[in-house]
Amino acid sequence: KNYWAHVDSSAYSRQMQYYYDTFGFSKIGSVYGDEIVCAIPDYTSVAEENGFTIVGYKLEREAFADEDEYYNRLESIYRRMVREDGVDAYILNTDVIPSVEKAAELMKIFYDANIPVVAQVGSAYVKGGAAMMIVDPRDAVGTGPFVSNIIGSVFNGSVPEDLEQEYVSSPFLTLNLDVADEIGYKPSFEMLIACEKIICSE
């Protein structure tokens, strides 16, 4: 009873739901190393509820002898997604491509086919042109006051286990307009208003 932890069990479900509501895709591609880290169960649940398909490939970097071999395999999967699987969106999952520059290079495969790429985590991917959009499920601006209120309650005598643990973050949306323009995507006025950050070269 002396422990407390912040939880947000539906963060990635809400994220995928937002992406689906925005793009209305029928098949979204996903390459992942670890199902739990990449929130595959959460995403799959949303897919089943909404009737779209996740075209998933499991690929562990540690299984490859060198980086070049890994990225060559990754590139071949991406090309297969576009040419054979018929994906109409792609989600860039956690830790699949640590380098933003490399991610931007490989995501051109999707952009050349006018397929939007969204990110699971890391607004740097949006800033670097690797992803068009991210709805960050972790809102530090909102979570901070929530946690500080909990700490204050504990200092004032409350028992940690009796305090609220779940905080549902507001979506933190970052959009790259240059990428959107490249693939011919026109964001709505409502989306632009909802953005916390808009990346644009002009």
Sequence positions of predicted segments:
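Short beta-strand elements at the ligand-binding edges of bilobed clamshell
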Residues: 1-18, 129-145
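Short beta-strand elements in bilobed, periplasmic/extracellular small-molecule ligand-binding domains
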Residues: 47-71
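Loop/turn elements at helix/coil->beta-strand transitions in domains of secreted/extracellular proteins
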Residues: 2, 25-27, 50-55, 85-90, ...
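Periplasmic-binding protein-like
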Residues: 29-32, 81-99, 118-120
